[in-house]
Amino acid sequence: MSLNDLQRFRNLFAYEKVDRCVYWGAPAPWAETLERWKKEGYDPTKPLPHPDDGRIVHSTWFFPHPPFERKIIAEDEDTITYINHEGIVMRERKDFPDSSMPQFIRFPVETREEFRQFRKERFRANLEERIGPNYREILSSYQDRDCPLIIIADRWGGFFGGVRAMVGVERACLLFYDDPAFLEEMMDSIADFLIEMMDKIVQYTDVDVFGFWEDMAYKTGPLVGPELYRKFALPRYKRVVDFLRSKGVKYISLDSDGNIYSLIPIWLDAGINVLYPFEVQAGMDVVKVRKEFGKELRMWGGIDKRALAQSREAIDAELRRVEPLVKEGGYIPCLDHSIPPDVPYDNYLYYAEKLWELVNSL
């Protein structure tokens, strides 16, 4: 039995027979990690021992458009303060800005009037500008694909994440109490935008996975109480999910770091059936999640990246921990986040080889 990457993905998530599990083992290292690995023998021009199963992922189509013009506001020896493409004023380190947390100084929306102008100017479903003038040809070409098509709305595709991107974390949390009507107006606009975008996309191609993005939890729990979040977000999730299902999108995913146990029932009630990345250091355990919530919830991620910084024995133990899910199906084993610079290159190579053995052990 031999399947292409699309058939394998679909069969795996349908709990049907596969030739092996999906392999997503390619690294996502920090910039500092790459610098270390190059000193340890990594050559970025050479192919990896086991290339990932193919997947077409688009995660930039839903950002504010037109993007804000990057404008430098201040600069010193170590940092730079600027307006980014989302309209956020942020201060970043000059060395390795992608792997250090910026300081967020101002967000693009502070008032209703600013939000309504923002929505009018940058929440337009203009595919010819977001994808390209030949968007019809691009999307239609995916009908002949041999791997899954995954469309992620990323930072603007959620009912906490999208609000947070406009007003900041603290204001997003307080709006649930201080101005729920304004919060609902923003949530409804996000839902409208997601539906309008996807309604145009599915005219030209089917889609395997649509992805929400939230990142709304820290180490011990969510930033908003589950009951309160259910009240506001569930109706909007359901509206988008019901629309997507009516257009044939079978798998609806959601990405949130942190400890999300108390939010999972909300997302399942909305019809979301794929979650990731299950950060182990935040207490998430994919084996426990499967036992508690069952096979209707598909997953990817859940392998503790910190094991790669320890030893081969730690890597072996971590892969043994998730092995039952690999055998059961509906799960793609991969790291729970990008690889920090305390991971030796040899340890990554060992992990990749052992992961390859695991996905072929069915």
Pin down the residues of each PLM region.
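Charged, low-complexity surface segments at secondary-structure and domain boundaries
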Residues: 21-24, 33-42, 100-107, 120-125
